[in-house]
Amino acid sequence: MLNRATMDMLTAMKMSAMAAEFANQLKDPAFNELGFEERLGMLVNAEWNRRQCNKLDRFIRNAQFAVPSATVEGIEYHEDRKLDKAQILRFATCKYIDEGHHIILKGASGNGKTYIACALGNAACRRFKKVQYIRMPELLDELSIARSGGTLKKVLESYKKKDLLILDEWLIRPLSPQESYDMLEIVEARCQKSMIFCTQYQSEGWYTRIDPNPESDSPVSEAIMDRIIHNAYEVLVDGRVSMRERKGLKAAREGGGQDV
């Protein structure tokens, strides 16, 4: 009766893993040979592990990754991709986040930049760092709506709090003057905070996409570039075959399709 009441109280206190482990100990006579401290340690460990797993799931869910299942272990290092595995593994330690550096993933569409970015984001979540993934067109829309609704400061503050911001489709299209200022606000708000940029364009081509007017000598382009380029690791994600095509061929072979 006392044991049942104990399990009910553990469940009421939302210590479900501890309650389950306690029930297992009651069922198995072998646990009777263990000391009180050891059995208590096993109960606490079970509850700790459950809460850490739930916390990790929450961090990953809140990050809103395009590829939530992406992992550093799942990155493919085909020769034509020219990826430096040692460098990727160093990124996975999140030291660049601790030091406030950025990462620029450059490459053609379909070369797997998004997967790598989400994999590094997942690695950061596993170290319980707050991560946010967003496509640049969606971010620009969000900032525009926030400015119209008078909540721009609140939105900027929310992005400022993230340990890592992943901006996919960076400069996928040229920016309007207002959008350029908005991006400067984001970059400035994240001073000394890390960002990952996924882009199809070399960094020297960013100026004309931030400010498409060839007659303009806007300081905004220079301000954005200065806050990113000089503090970033640039990684080329190459490949003669796109990862979408590569995955399609692999699926066809595994499904009994024609060997290509």
Predicted regions and their residues:
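Charged, compositionally biased N-terminal leader segments and the immediate start
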Residues: M1-A19
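Conserved phosphate/pyrophosphate-binding and hydrolysis machinery centered on Walker-type P-loop NTPases
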Residues: A12, P29-L34, F65, Y77-R81, ...
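Interdomain "pre-motor" coupling segment immediately N-terminal to P-loop NTPase/helicase cores
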Residues: S16-P68
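Extended interfacial segments that mediate partner engagement and assembly in macromolecular machines
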Residues: C53-K106
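Conserved P-loop
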Residues: L83-K161, Y207, E254
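Short, well-ordered alpha-helix to beta-strand connector turns
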Residues: K162-D163, A232
